[in-house]
Amino acid sequence: MDTTHAHHTAAIRFFPTAQRNGWATCPLVQNAFVRIFGQPGYRNGPGSPDLARQLLAHYLDFSSHQFLPDDISLCDLARFPSLAGPKALTDLYLLALAVKHGTRFATFDSGINHSLIPGGTAAYHLIPTT
């Protein structure tokens, strides 16, 4: 996709493993991909949300892909006993979603406090960038 992205090489190394073991997206992640990658000004992007959506649809057709519904709430105190700052909410939400569905949350972000989510430490997977 974006060969100039800081983590492009790491993503290329990681994706074959994800394909073998299975990988997942949810509406939140899909929307973010189309919104960001589809911006006309995004360098090396497809130029429009429609084209980004077509590219996303191609990857979603892979047999290794699993769709996870956005079926948890930040108001569920059992899943979210404590919240970090506002910049961490989306990552914690995605981590809790992975816990609920018995999968893992793969990320390049080493700053996520995965211990805030019950089961989060086991579900957190940091993708190596070096």
Feature roles, as predicted:
Residues 1-25, 37, 41-51, 120, ...:
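Short, well-structured N-terminal submotif of metal-dependent ribonuclease cores
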Residues 72-84, 92-130:
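Acidic, PIN/NYN-like endoribonuclease modules and their adjacent C-terminal/linker elements
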Residues 19-22, 64, 102:
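Residue-level detector of structured alpha->beta connecting loops
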Residues 11, 90-91:
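Amphipathic coiled-coil/heptad-repeat helices and related helical stalk/stem segments
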